[in-house]
Structure formats: structure tokens, C-alpha cells
Amino acid sequence: MEFPVARNPQVKWKTGMLNEAEEMKDADFPEIRLFHVEHQLAPDGEKEDCVGKWVVCNPENLKDFSAVGFVFGRKLYKELSTPVGLIQSTWGGTHAESWTSMKVMENNPLYADVLKQYSKEKVSREKDKCKVPATLWNGMIAPIVGSVSYTHLRAHETVLDL
């Protein structure tokens, strides 16, 4: 089973759990793995594959997992007795529209202004290219077919309407 999870890579790993030190020490689950998707822009269409690396859930690698991903993966593993693959596909400071498919945006009037505002020609600075609508969907999500997502979005009002 594979499930994408996200964490902010700029934030030091903290679970918010009262027993955080114990959780980290006991986090030895070789059948729970995390695939970290490398950053890949794709403004011109969906990619068929993505690049990344797998890490095993152990005390040393737990810092690579989000707290939600770790707890979720552990719960699935214990309840289902099956290996679990978690997928982390993140890019800090990006907009929800970058992670939304062009098909969804073109068929939803809520996105009309967004699509006008962010034409490829208007995004010239390299650091802003990750904010082009659908570019992160195309490069980092579309290659991962059939996934469940958990994320903390700033644009939750728009996303919830989908």
C-alpha cells in the first residue's frame, strides 16, 4: 500500500506527542518505507515517471517522515499486517493550484482568474516557476497514480469546493 504524506522540510521534526523521545527510539519498522519525490517542474504536461529515493522507517530516518505520515503508516502496518509505502511529495511556499491538475482547473470556473494570472510568459523568475498552475501536479503527482493525500493547504476554501 502506498500513501502520500507531506511535511515542511524547513521545520525541525516534532511530533507534538507527549512521548516523542520514546516514539523516535521505538520507530523500527523495516516494512514501512517513505518515498521522497524529488522536485520536478512540468509546465507542459503530465510526466509518466518521477525520481526520488526510498528510506526505511527506523530511528535514524524518522526525521525524513512527517509526524502524520509516521503515525498513519504505523497504524496501517499494525492493523493490516502488510508492508506500507508512504510518499512525500512537497515543495514549500507553493500554491494549491500548482498541485492541481489542469483538467480540474479548466473545468471549474473558480480557477478562471488563476489561469489568466499565471500564463507561462508572466512567470519569468526561476524561483517562481514552481507556482505555475498544474506544474507540480504534472511533475510530482500525476506520475503517482491512485493515491490518497493528506496536506495542510492555505487555499483550503478553493480545494474543498472541488
Q: What is the role of each PLM region?
A:
Residues 1-148:
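Metal/cofactor- and membrane transport-associated sequence elements
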Residues 151, 155-158:
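Conserved small/polar residues in nucleotide/adenosyl-binding loops
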Residues 162:
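Cytosolic catalytic cores of cyclic-nucleotide second-messenger enzymes
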